[in-house]
Amino acid sequence: LRLVDGTARNHGRVEVLHAGVWGTVCDDFISTSGPRQTGFISVACGQLGFSGAGSAPTSGFPDGVDPTWMDDLDCAGTEASLPMCTFRGWGVENCAHFEDIGLSCTP
């Protein structure tokens, strides 16, 4: 997992490595406040080595150009990494890159 095109190491567009290729995560299910967004933030920030607190902005970053690897992400918040969350399947998505999710974690 990495954050790219942000202003600091704890802020940027979320990308996940699958099959040796970096790709984006679609904001479906996690773009609005609620348990799914909270779970996503907790897992992603924790996986990156941050406190697990933060926000998930859907704008402010350039659109990704890599494949969209994950869509309809549903994390309880207890998973060790994003691939352990429920999602549609690697590369199974109905998103455009303007829907790429960002992340801002508390350092």
Predicted region positions:
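Intrinsic disorder and flexible/low-complexity segments
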Residues: L1-P107
